[in-house]
Amino acid sequence: MVRFLSGIAAVLLVAAPAAARDILFVGNSFTFGAGAPVQQYRPDSVTDLNREGIGGVPALFRSFAEQAGLDWTVSLETSPGKDLAFHYANKRAAIDRRWDVVILQGYSTLDADNPGDPTRHGIAAGQLAALVHARNRQAQVELVETWSRADLTYRPGSRWSGKPIAAMANDLAAANRRVARTTRGISGTIPVGSAWNRAIATGVADANPYDGIDPGKLGLWADDHYHGSAAGYYLEALTIFGRVTRYDVRRLGAGERSAADLGLTGQQAAALQRIAWETLRRRNR
């Protein structure tokens, strides 16, 4: 009888759904999806802690989770043009609660006054991580490695001017990984910029929006050549989702509904899913 009841308990345990998890996105326009319809995508599916009615990349994450059968409660705290130090100084009251996962996305050049310098970025990341871990010592805190800005690559006056389009993203990735290695409480980084680079290198996406978008390729930047397009944010969201959940994003498939909502074809969605998966696989080797 005891063995029989134990067997039933085991079956029930296996059949029980995974516990819901909470994720918070902290960032700026690269998180809320400025310059693309992503910004207003399904705002009712997420909780905007600033009550601005934003969906953004967090709403794409939630959509992927629903389609994958994963139970995630998704929140965001975003402000345009701000770095992580701003969020720590001004938004602690909103952030200071229990989270399972927190995604930190900083300024596009790490430091507005000293582009490429991760010092201020790293200090603020550590402060936010400490705030999060005071509520949940097991929380996963990840830094987003953002993409190369075409405007800072193909126009003069930037430290990245005239360099290959992959250079800025590579520099940002190296800086974020250094912060993760040396800052207590940071679990790791998410290679969004590397995914953009891979999409360009493999011919899925166009390298230079200033000379037009090559036929058959996707444009990853918005019209300002700075923020993301629908495709660019879609690739960002896929990379974050795959990293956080360890879900093989290729399984979302050509029929993934958010891609269709954003005007991407099934073929384009599948190509971006493959790029995100390949980027994460290479990173995890």
List each language-model region with its residue ranges.
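Short polar catalytic/cofactor-binding loops
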Residues: G27-F32
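Acidic carboxylate-rich catalytic motifs and surrounding loops in phosphoryl-/glycosyl-chemistry enzymes
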Residues: V74-G81, I190-A195, A254-E256
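Conserved SGNH/GDSL esterase-like catalytic core that processes O-acyl groups on lipids
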Residues: G33-H133, A270
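Alpha-helical cap/lid subdomain in secreted, periplasmic
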Residues: A93-A230, G242
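Bacterial N-terminal signal peptides that target proteins for export
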Residues: M1-I8
